Swiss-Prot record:
Oligomeric form and interacting partners: Homodimer. Interacts with ALK. Interacts with LRP1; promotes neuronal survival. Interacts with LRP2. Interacts with NCAM1. Interacts (via C-terminal) with PTPRZ1 (via chondroitin sulfate chains); this interaction is inhibited by PTN; this interaction promotes neuronal migration. Interacts with NCL; this interaction promotes NCL clustering and lateral movements of this complex into lipid rafts leading to MDK internalization. Interacts with LRP6 and LRP8: this interaction is calcium dependent. Interacts with ITGA4. Interacts with ITGA6. Interacts with ITGB1.
Lineage of producing organism: Eukaryota, Metazoa, Chordata, Craniata, Vertebrata
Family: Belongs to the pleiotrophin family.
Transmembrane spans: none
Coiled-coil zones: none
Organism domain of life: Eukaryota
Subcellular location field: Secreted
InterPro entries: Midkine_heparin-bd_GF, PTN/MK_C_dom, PTN/MK_C_dom_sf, PTN/MK_diS_sf, PTN/MK_N_dom, PTN/MK_N_dom_sf, PTN_MK_heparin-bd_GF_CS
Cystine crosslinks: C37-C61, C45-C70, C52-C74, C84-C116, C94-C126
Protein name listed in UniProt: Midkine
Any one of the GO CC terms: extracellular region
Entry keyword annotation includes Transmembrane helix: no
Secreted among keywords: yes
Summary of the tissues where the protein is detected: Expressed in various tumor cell lines. In insulinoma tissue predominantly expressed in precancerous lesions.
Length: 143
């Protein structure tokens, strides 16, 4: 008799566990990409600490809200955002008056419906010619 009771209890526990797993899968499917909502509006990726690294992006569609993991590269340019991808030309010649080089970038891809400029211009300081350093390295190897 005890054997039958133990077997019945085990069968009920297994049935309850299977039912709970099925309900959990249904909940995941309802909020995921297969939901009725087609036009998600995604916000920017907000890093969890400092200004780069792993973080979260919030999306809304009607009354639904979702948070997904994302990553902001640590070498991103804050002026035009991490979700705007550009194809850049080569650096231009050094402008002696300002001491900077300029290049232009054309928008290649806007991720997560980001508002991006079609073209951007970026500058960087000109690097001084380093011929003296190159000669010094050659001389060090010879004894």
């Amino acid at each position: 008799m005890q054997h039958r009771g133990f077997l019945l209890l085990t069968l009920l526990a297994l049935l309850a566990l299977t039912s709970a797993v099925a309900k959990k899968k249904d909940k995941v499917k309802k909020g995921g990409p297969g939901s009725e909502c087609a036009e998600w509006a995604w916000g920017p990726c907000t890093p969890s600490s400092k200004d780069c690294g792993v973080g979260f992006r919030e999306g809304t569609c009607g009354a639904q809200t979702q948070r997904i993991r994302c990553r902001v590269p640590c070498n991103w340019k804050k002026e035009f955002g991490a979700d705007c991808k550009y194809k850049f030309e080569n650096w231009g010649a050094c402008d002696g008056g300002t001491g900077t080089k300029v290049r232009q970038g054309t928008l290649k891809k806007a991720r997560y419906n980001a508002q991006c400029q079609e073209t951007i211009r970026v500058t960087k300081p000109c690097t001084p010619k380093t011929k003296a350093k190159a000669k010094a390295k050659k001389g060090k190897g010879k004894d």
